[in-house]
Amino acid sequence: MEEKQTLPDSRPPTPYHIWDGGEWLLPEEVRETARYWAAAEKWEEIKQKRHDNLRGGVYVDSVGKWFHSTDEARQQYTFMRTLSALPPDLMWKTMNGDFVNLTRPLLDELSLKLITDEQKDFANAERHKRLLEQSSEPWNYDYSGGWMEIYKEKS
């Protein structure tokens, strides 16, 4: 009578892992190769998270609103900073659909917040990179912590 084999209920952590009928194993002879490629793949995920976060909105305390931080929005903010004066009564649409009067002080606060949040997320990505490089199992590395908050629509 043949023994019934247990099938895995998940994908292997890396393409180098093999199923022994009860758990995923990583043969010693491919451990460093698997570790290298898993770390490289995870680092790409971290960079993508940083990229997405930078475009996920920025919260400006003085008006209590989220502003867009897409590449297009950043370009508009940069252009407006080159103007000697903003158009009077310039109404700007925020991420929740409300409009606010965009003044020079508000544009300054918004610009500073964009730079500050970007630098914090950059530092966080670098922190995760260092920890990832130290990990013996980079395929299991959790990089979800330490990121700046991004806009989430209320449902």
Model-flagged regions — what are they?
Residues M1-S155:
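A preference for well-ordered globular domain cores
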